[in-house]
Amino acid sequence: MSEKAPFMVFSGTNSRYLAEKICASLDCPLGNMNITHFADGEFAVSYEESIRGAHVFLVQSTFPNSDNLMELLLMIDAAKRASAKSVVAVIPYFGWARQDRKDKPRVSIGAKLVADLLSVAGIDRLITMDLHADQIQGFFNIPVDHLYASAVFLPYIQSLQLENLVIATPDVGGSKRASTFSKYLGVPLVLCNKSREKANEVASMQIIGDVEGKIVVLIDDIVDTAGTITKAANIMLEAGAQSVRAIASHCVMSDPASFRVQESALTEMVFTDSIPYAKKCPKVKQLSIADMFAETIKRVMNNESISSQYII
């Protein structure tokens, strides 16, 4: 991208709080946009200032999924029609990412469909974080900058100065992510093997590794109903763990997640602010990713390496 053209940052309804933090880090104003809602449930998007010839960055997580995704698509379309030089979708939480493959007959691949919708709407680049499946990047024919929340989580874990620490994953599918944490910190890795009878319900779980007398930090990407993460915490405490805390990138927290976290063995549940969390749960803490996304926008504009800012 050319350095001569200006860049502008705009936000959808869902991520304005994060966009404001990103703009504060960039020392630039948040662009003016009007989103009009109609009685029939439709809405319309208009830019309240000229974006002709500008590199436009649109900040919007797609959760709750449908309305925020549609809002983002309209933002992209309006920007292209207003002669923006380029349009970059900044999607901290990429909804539909758990629908990344056909795991049974006659089902859609939602992540691929969303990728197609964004591409057809006209984005030139995607900036996102901790996709549920890395291969989703291959659904796009444009550059995808895939950031990792480890850049904020690892310094936080180190600041706690925990002794007898082990890193754990609540399911085998997250072992690669947890393994990178354990290797970076130089501590053991513990796995949980779970089985489900149906979506959002964990039938059974077994621990693979030793947690007796250990301080456990569970690593995950998404916490939805919190059934898996809280069950893992409770089982580890029963197995002799000294304490259990959890860290996850995306705070979906569908009901009854807040209740489950509060009533569980977890001492704290730490997320990024990729998704706003308005419910009250004293155990929940959010770390901001605004500086990381601001730095990425700077590097995109300056044609600098993105991957060099990753910790892992």
Annotated model-derived regions:
Residues 1-312:
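PRPP-associated nucleotide enzymes
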